[in-house]
Amino acid sequence: MPNEIFLLGVGHSTPFFAELAEACEYTVAGLYHYNDDRTGQTDHGFPILGSFNDLYNSDIDGKNFMLTMGNMAIKREVSKNLIRRGGIIPTLVHPNAVISQFADISECGVLVCSSCEIHSDAIVGEGCVLWPQVVVEHNTQLHDYVFCGPKAYVGAYIEIFDQAFIGQCSVCISGKIDSIGESAIIGAGAVVTKNVPPNVIVKGNPATIYKKV
C-alpha cells in the first residue's frame, strides 16, 4: 500500500517515531531490527518482521522506510543499501512544524518532529533528524545526516557539516560562528560562540573543546 511504511531500528524511540509516521498519515506496517534476536516479537503493538539482512534479501522495490537509529553513520549506510535495492526513504515533517516556504529540505530521509521551526533560506540535507522544538534560523545549512536534539537552537548563517550532533538545548549563536565541523558533537546545553572543528566534543558555556572523537 502506498501509505505503508516500515521502521528500521527497534528501541526506546520506536513509539516516538511510529507516532511521527502516523502524524504524517503513514500506516506502520512493521519493524526491522539489526539482528534476528527479536524476530516474531512485537514492540508497542508493532510486529518485528526480521533483521536488516532479511530485509535486504527481500523485494523492497517501491516500499517506504523510516530509519530510526541514532548512529548517523549506520543510518547513512543503511539508507544507501535500501535505495540501491529500490526502497524509498521519504522525508517526514510533523504537521505542526513551522517550515518557511523558502526553506530547502531534502526529500530523502529527513525527520522533522513536532514544534520545529525551519526559517527562510535554510537548507536541510539528506537524512537529518530534528527532534521536537528545534529551531534552524535563516540562511543556515545542515549538511547530510546532522542530528539536532530537542530544543536545540541553530542560529543564522551557520554551516553544519555531515554527521554533526547538536545536543539537546544547545545554542549556536548567530554572528558568532560560521561552521560546525563534520562529526563534531555539541554537548547538551552548550552555548557555542566560536567555530567548532571536525571530530571534537565541545561542552559548556561558552563551549570549549572537551576531547577529540
Language model regions located:
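Nucleotide donor/acceptor-binding cores
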Residues: 3, 63, 182
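Short alpha-helical
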Residues: 12, 73-74, 105
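Short amphipathic alpha-helical segments
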Residues: 18-20, 77-81, 124, 197-198
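A generic structural motif
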Residues: 24-28
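Phosphate-bearing ligand-interacting subdomains
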Residues: 37-98
